[in-house]
Amino acid sequence: MQFELIQNTDTESTAVYKIARVVYNETGAKSLPLVEAFTSMIKNIARSRGISPVDVVGDKQIFMARDNNDVCAASREFQMCVRTVRRAMRGNLPDSVFGATRFHWACDMPDWAVARGYIADVDGMLFYL
C-alpha cells in the first residue's frame, strides 16, 4: 500500500492560521478589542518592514509566546482570532493602534519602553510606535 502526500494548496488559510496562532498565544484571546489591536499591530509591522504578516509572526525577537502549539483550533477564542486575522488580511480591519509596531503587557516594563510613551492601551497591553 502506498500513501500519497496531500499538499494544502490554500496558502491564504495556512497564513491566516499561522498568524492567528501567534495572536492567540500572545493575547490569550482576552477580548475582541485586544485581538483586533494586536492583529493591527502585526499589519503595521509588515507594512513598515515591507514584508508579509506571516514573516512578521515568525520573528522570535518580537513574539516570545509563539512556540505554544497547544491551541485547540475548534475553541471559540481561537476562532475569534482566525476571523479577525482573516478580516485584516482582506483589508477590512481598521488600525486601532494608530500605527503602533511595538507592544508589551502593562505588568512588564522592558528596557526599550522606559523612556517612551505608549499610544494605545487595550485591555492591559500597551502599544508603541
Features from the language model and the residues they span:
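Bacterial extracytoplasmic/cell-wall-associated proteins, especially those involved in peptidoglycan
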Residues: 3-129
